Each structure stands twice: as C-alpha cells, then as structure tokens.
Amino acid sequence: MIVPRLALPISLALQRVSRRVAEHPHNLRILQRHMSSVYFRSGAIKPKPEEMPFGLLAIFCAVIPGLFVGATISKNVANFLEENDLFVPADDDDDED
C-alpha cells in the first residue's frame, strides 16, 4: 500500500530531472559531479577505503561508558529533586494497572 503511494511522486521527480537534463545539457555534468566521489577524473574506480580494525569494539567502548555516565547523572538529579521536595512521586500513581 505504501509502495503505490511513493511510486507516483518518485516517477514525477524522475520525469522532472530528465526534462531539466534534456533542456540544459550542462545539468547532466552537475549530476555526474555529485556521484564522482567513487571515481577519479579519469573514470577509474577509486580503491576501497581502509576499514578500521576493531571498529565495533571502538563503538562499544564509546557507547557503554556514555550510557553509564548518563544513568548516573539522571539518578543523582532524581535524588536531588526528591531530597529537596521539588518532585516527589506519588505512591497512588502506581496502582492504576
């Protein structure tokens, strides 16, 4: 159901782009430059970029400590708010199951 809804706008957009390219051939060069990061000016394909070894481990080493620091900060703020009577959760709110 979603695909037919998207098919018409996509086809209309492609028709507009093809009309613009047909009217002004220099627009084709602009479109080609947009995708030129894969190719050299000579047309040769650039080599595959180097992958970082242990990239997934580096992500975990950055995300996990961030989660713990965020949880600690939020716990301390919640305790501060409750100690100073700025926000005290009501016990009767938990019985609404």
UniProtKB/Swiss-Prot annotation:
Domain of life: Eukaryota
Transmembrane feature ranges: 53-73
Gene Ontology CC terms: uniplex complex
GO biological process: calcium import into the mitochondrion; defense response to Gram-negative bacterium; mitochondrial calcium ion homeostasis; mitochondrial calcium ion transmembrane transport; positive regulation of innate immune response
Intracellular or extracellular location(s): Mitochondrion inner membrane
Disruption phenotype: RNAi-mediated knockdown in muscle results in mitochondrial calcium uptake defects.
Main localization (coarse): mitochondrion
Coiled coil: none
InterPro entries cross-referenced by the UniProt entry: MCU_reg (IPR018782)
A GO molecular-function annotation: calcium channel activity
Membrane topology reported for the UniProt record: Single-pass membrane protein
Keyword entries, A-Z: Calcium, Calcium transport, Ion transport, Membrane, Mitochondrion, Mitochondrion inner membrane, Transit peptide, Transmembrane, Transmembrane helix, Transport
Transit peptide, start-end: 1-35
PANTHER family linked to this entry: ESSENTIAL MCU REGULATOR, MITOCHONDRIAL (PTHR33904:SF1)
Similarity comment text for this entry: Belongs to the SMDT1/EMRE family.
Protein name: Essential MCU regulator, mitochondrial
Organism, scientific name: Drosophila melanogaster (Fruit fly)
